[in-house]
Amino acid sequence: MIEYTIRDGFPKFQDLPWDYSLTNWPGLTDRLEEVQRGISRHPVVFVNYEGSLYAIKELPTGVALSEYQMLLKMQEQHLPCVEPVGYVQISTGNCQRSAIITSYLDLSLPYRSLFMHSNLGRYRDHLLDAIAGLLVQLHLAGFFWGDCSFSNTLFRRDAGALQAYLVDAETTEHHACPLSPMLRNHDLEIMQANIQRDVF
């Protein structure tokens, strides 16, 4: 059984091979696109509908719903994050899983691109400022990220600087705003550990 929850104004995504894990989609649909991507702990694919790209991430059952709801709350507060499109619950035989669908963030770059391409080197010094600025915005709005890292962020160039966008809200929680000092400090500790891992 496959259950779709998709926002109005977007494709229905019902022609995709949901009976199979995303890792098996190559060769099963001609909608797949290759784009620059960061590192993800879960399978991720990009699909093309009439020139618009969408990211699909496979998750354990139920997780896509919670991430979708968090992204909706962030979007309602005009926070910089990817646009949530919908989620899918899949139950095939003994296998249960879910998937979240988001709009592809045009003109964005994963942090590794800023290290791999010499012509983008001038932006590297702005990475920390950009992700720290994103974290401050989230905390002021009452969001605890729980997994702040370069890998869970995309960047857009903005007048010589960078704007950071949250792309992974699996561990995000919404609390009273502004966030408590204890949770803010915990998020900062997680960010420090994750960034050291990302870079080194």
Model-assigned labels for residue ranges:
Residues 13-125, 129-146:
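Conserved ATP-binding subdomain of kinase catalytic cores across diverse folds
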Residues 59, 158, 178:
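Surface loops and adjacent helix of pleckstrin homology
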Residues 162-200:
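C-lobe/activation-segment region of protein kinase-like
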Residues 148-155:
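Hydrophobic residue at the +6 position relative to the catalytic HRD Asp in the kinase catalytic loop
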Residues 97-100, 151, 162:
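Generic beta-strand structural signal
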Residues 106, 159, 170:
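Short, flexible active-site-adjacent loop segments at beta-strand->alpha-helix junctions, enriched
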Residues 1-19:
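N-terminal presequences and immediately downstream first alpha-helices
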Residues 155-161:
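Activation-loop N-terminal segment of eukaryotic-like protein kinases
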